[in-house]
A protein has these predicted regions:
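Primarily recognizes the serine-hydrolase "nucleophile elbow" in alpha/beta-hydrolase
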Residues: 1-45
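Short catalytic/ligand-binding loop motif for oxyanion handling, primarily in non-cytosolic enzymes
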Residues: 9, 60, 98-100
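Cell-envelope and extracellular/periplasmic
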Residues: 14-16, 25-29, 48-62, 93-95
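Loop/turn elements at helix/coil->beta-strand transitions in domains of secreted/extracellular proteins
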Residues: 20-24, 47-49, 84-88
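Short aromatic-enriched loop/helix-cap "lid" or pocket-rim segments at secondary-structure transitions
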Residues: 38, 64-65, 102-105
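C-terminal catalytic histidine-bearing segment of alpha/beta-hydrolase fold enzymes
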Residues: 53, 70, 74-115
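Short, flexible/disordered intra-domain loops and linkers
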Residues: 59-71
């Protein structure tokens, strides 16, 4: 399962709640969402493969809650690396949230299927 932006956050949530998905792709996920980091801090994902990506300019937001996105995705990736049975990957892309979403989503799914 995978998605971009809020759909990316939903895909991550699915990967924590259900064992139906072996891989999760989350391109520019809305990990700034209030409560998300507390949620993942107390759970282990059920998906065995998790791909994250974010644009390097996404944290340059005027809205303070949304500006936490880069710190949160880095913290999430650090959490995922603690699990030896979860393969995770974080890719930093050039630009903001709306730069090349189709390409970034495609790259995520290519990673998920192992090509």
């Amino acid at each position: 399962i995978g998605g971009y932006s809020l759909a990316g956050l939903f895909a991550l949530w699915c990967g924590y709640e259900s064992d139906l998905f072996t891989a999760v792709t989350a391109a520019s996920p809305s990990v700034w969402y209030p409560g998300w980091m507390d949620y993942v801090g107390h759970r282990k994902p059920k998906a065995g493969r998790i791909y994250l990506s974010l644009g390097d300019a996404e944290a340059k937001m005027k809205q303070p809650v949304m500006a936490t996105v880069a710190d949160n995705i880095t913290a999430l990736y650090d959490m995922l690396k603690k699990y030896s049975d979860v393969r995770s990957f974080l890719e930093w892309n050039v630009g903001g949230h709306f730069r090349e979403p189709a390409l970034r989503t495609a790259k995520a799914f290519v990673w998920a299927v192992g090509w």
